[in-house]
Amino acid sequence: MKYLTDIGYYDDILPQKYGFEEMRVKKYDVGDSFDTHIDVSDYASARRWLAFLVYLKDNFSGGETEFVDGKMIHPKTGTVLVFPSLWTFPHAGLPVKSGTKYILTTYFHYV
């Protein structure tokens, strides 16, 4: 974990035991979207610490990931979006305008 100390973070901020949730591939067709939400909303999801979203292709229009602070992530094949899964990061998947969007998602967990 030396790279963390190089940027001013220390091992004690990371959970002592951790793991990843199963990966899911999601398909969004024209008009499909995901309304504004947070990724930790109940007991079952309470162990989520970081969200990972991988854009698997970008030959479609629309489908951006938008955070409520106005930050917009435009899909690009191979890009990995990582952000805290907490209530402080509500976000939405905007509607796909043409083509088909594929993403892979997983979460870093406290165990």
Which residue stretches match the model-derived regions?
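Fe(II)/2-oxoglutarate oxygenase catalytic core
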Residues: 1-80, 88-111
